[in-house]
């Protein structure tokens, strides 16, 4: 009798455990709750930043709004830094991450990625007087970037040991460090550099070299396969329907280029 009860308790425990760890934030849960929580950049124009009226605006914000509209649920925007994106998803603080996130094998160990929804490349940007043609020319220079970002991962691999890499907590601080000449080189996304140039036409900034082509993907927690499938259908539908192209034209000033599907 004792053995039977023991088995019953163990079986019950694992059943509850499995339900509690796999059902959280999947498609059916989002629909039943009537709300989707989506992480967006807290300060990374033009993808996500505080607008003139105090609300969050940007490419990723518009995509998040479109996701909620097509799900037919309320949207809760959760502004995050680069370092917060994956932890917030893993701990169920958000259901999706739409925050200029590139996909790589290391990140794919922790979360799932959708097909790409936005164009992006990472590069090194600096004043015209600096002769920089590749990573080796960064030797002895101060390079500013956002800690935990894709640029951080990539430049750390290829920069000479004498490069002084200065990591900042968010993109706003990184960009400010470059414009105030705290660093010699800005390592960031092309859109961030373009935004700086647009804000100040007199700013001396050039693309020195491309570090990596890195389109943006939507992050989905592992185990939420129905939600991932829905997101991929959503992206395909909005590519074909022109909605993503309209968002690209609005925020990046360019047509949506061909993007990889996963």
Indicate residue ranges for each PLM-predicted region.
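Short helix-initiation/N-cap motifs at beta->coil->alpha
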Residues: 61, 76-87, 166-180, 212-214
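A ligand-binding cleft/hinge motif common to bilobed small-molecule-binding domains
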Residues: 84-87, 101-109, 154-157, 179, ...
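Extended ligand-binding regions for polar small-molecule ligands
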Residues: 61-70, 136, 141-142, 149-150, ...
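Alpha-to-beta junction loops
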Residues: 36-37, 72-74, 91-99, 141-142, ...
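A conserved helix-loop-strand patch within extracytoplasmic ligand-binding domains
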Residues: 73-76, 83, 101-105, 115-162
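Extracytoplasmic small-molecule ligand-binding "clamshell" domains
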Residues: 25-100
């Amino acid at each position: 009798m004792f053995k039977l009860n023991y088995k019953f308790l163990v079986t019950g425990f694992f059943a509850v455990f499995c339900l509690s760890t796999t059902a959280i934030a999947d498609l059916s849960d989002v629909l039943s709750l009537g709300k989707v929580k989506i992480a967006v950049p807290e300060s990374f124009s033009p993808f996500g930043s505080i607008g003139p009226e105090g609300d969050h605006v940007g490419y990723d914000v518009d995509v998040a709004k479109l996701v909620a509209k097509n799900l037919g649920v309320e949207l809760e925007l959760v502004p995050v830094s680069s370092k917060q994106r994956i932890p917030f998803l893993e701990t169920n603080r958000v259901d999706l991450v739409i925050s200029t996130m590139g996909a790589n094998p290391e990140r794919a160990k922790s979360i799932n990625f959708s097909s790409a929804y936005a164009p992006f490349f990472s590069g090194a940007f600096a004043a015209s007087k600096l002769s920089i043609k590749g990573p080796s020319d960064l030797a002895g220079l101060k390079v500013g970037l956002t800690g935990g970002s894709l640029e951080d991962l990539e430049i750390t691999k290829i920069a000479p040991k004498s490069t002084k890499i200065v990591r900042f907590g968010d993109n706003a601080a990184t960009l400010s460090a470059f414009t105030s000449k705290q660093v010699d080189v800005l390592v960031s996304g092309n859109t961030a550099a373009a935004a700086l140039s647009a804000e100040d036409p007199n700013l001396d900034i050039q693309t020195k070299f491309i570090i990596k082509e890195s389109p943006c993907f939507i992050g989905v927690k592992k185990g939420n396969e129905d939600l991932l499938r829905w997101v991929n259908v959503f992206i395909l539908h909005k590519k074909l329907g022109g909605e993503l192209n309209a968002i690209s034209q609005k925020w990046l000033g360019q047509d949506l280029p061909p993007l990889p599907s996963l």
